[in-house]
């Protein structure tokens, strides 16, 4: 039988991340394969990639963890996942690009998921969230959400209508996650209802592979551990 290209094997195992990211992992000694080369075009990636043009990158970066958190809600998905989920919300730290995802059955759960996220990260890091950037979706603009942010000293940054590029970090994160999910699902024989598990796998992987924005992996910057 034909041997599997080890580089392609790791490409699939790592959620179909780019060859550039894989090379950095290999150069840093984080990939166990002693061989690193190229492989033929990945059909799953071609099926998974979206065709919209990329968002421009924001030029101002946070100088510390939790200084700025980007958030965006995605859904409803065309297929309900195991557990009855149709939406997910992301919270991404600007400095480290470390991201959290939460599966949701309804958009209205966004506020509760933010409080869950806030309690965990502020307790773990010993810091407080300063800014929360999101679009003007109704899930972010309830009086309850606004009152909570004020009580905790968190300034909301709501992007103007029709300007998703201003919330580009969240938009790029969600696009990358969905590209990875589509690539993984097209490569497997699993029912589409397993997309929630694929999404959690993609988020876990993204936090542990090199980012274009930072020198270390997001996980290393977030935890201070290599």
Please provide the spans of the model-predicted regions.
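HHCC-type zinc-binding knuckle of retroelement integrases
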Residues: 1-226
């Amino acid at each position: 039988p034909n041997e599997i290209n080890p580089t392609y094997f790791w490409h699939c195992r790592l959620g179909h991340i780019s060859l550039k990211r894989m090379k950095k992992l290999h150069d840093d000694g984080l990939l166990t394969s002693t061989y690193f080369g190229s492989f033929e075009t990945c059909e799953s990636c071609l099926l998974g990639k979206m065709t919209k043009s990329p968002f421009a990158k924001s030029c101002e970066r946070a100088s510390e963890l939790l200084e700025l958190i980007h958030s965006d809600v995605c859904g409803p998905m065309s297929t309900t996942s195991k557990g009855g989920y149709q939406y997910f919300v992301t919270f991404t730290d600007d400095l480290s690009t470390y991201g959290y995802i939460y599966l949701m059955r309804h958009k209205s759960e966004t506020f509760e998921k933010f409080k869950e996220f806030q309690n965990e990260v502020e307790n773990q890091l010993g810091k407080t969230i300063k800014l929360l950037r999101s679009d003007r979706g109704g899930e972010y603009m309830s009086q309850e959400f606004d009152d909570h942010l004020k009580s905790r000293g968190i300034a909301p940054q709501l992007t103007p209508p029709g300007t998703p590029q201003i919330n580009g970090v969240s938009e790029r994160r969600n696009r990358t996650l969905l590209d990875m999910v589509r690539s993984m699902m097209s490569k497997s024989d699993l029912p589409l209802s397993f997309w929630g598990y694929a999404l959690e796998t993609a988020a876990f992987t993204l936090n542990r592979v090199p980012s274009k924005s930072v020198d270390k992996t997001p996980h290393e910057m977030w935890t201070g551990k290599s």
